[in-house]
Swiss-Prot record:
Entry protein name: Large ribosomal subunit protein bL28
GO biological process, one term: translation
Organism (species): Acaryochloris marina (strain MBIC 11017)
Lineage of origin: Bacteria, Bacillati, Cyanobacteriota, Cyanophyceae, Acaryochloridales
Gene that specifies this protein: rpmB
Molecular functions (GO terms): structural constituent of ribosome
A Pfam family this chain is assigned to: Ribosomal_L28
Amino acid sequence: MGKKCQLTGKKANNAFAVSHSHRRTHKLQEANLQWKRVWWPQEKRWVKLRLSTKAIKTLEKKGLAAFAREAGINLNQV
């Protein structure tokens, strides 16, 4: 599984690290991804997802079923 949020699709960003002398070197800004076990009440089971921290906050607000429906994800295959 790649370094990508399963619900939002958030992934790493290419960027520059800029030194004091303004030398620019490439760096990768990784998304803040966490493994999270989420209770799925419709199926009465836990689902383990790799989520960004922003997705975790949104998940608490919207709920798992609604968020997965918006993202177009089938939770039975997770």
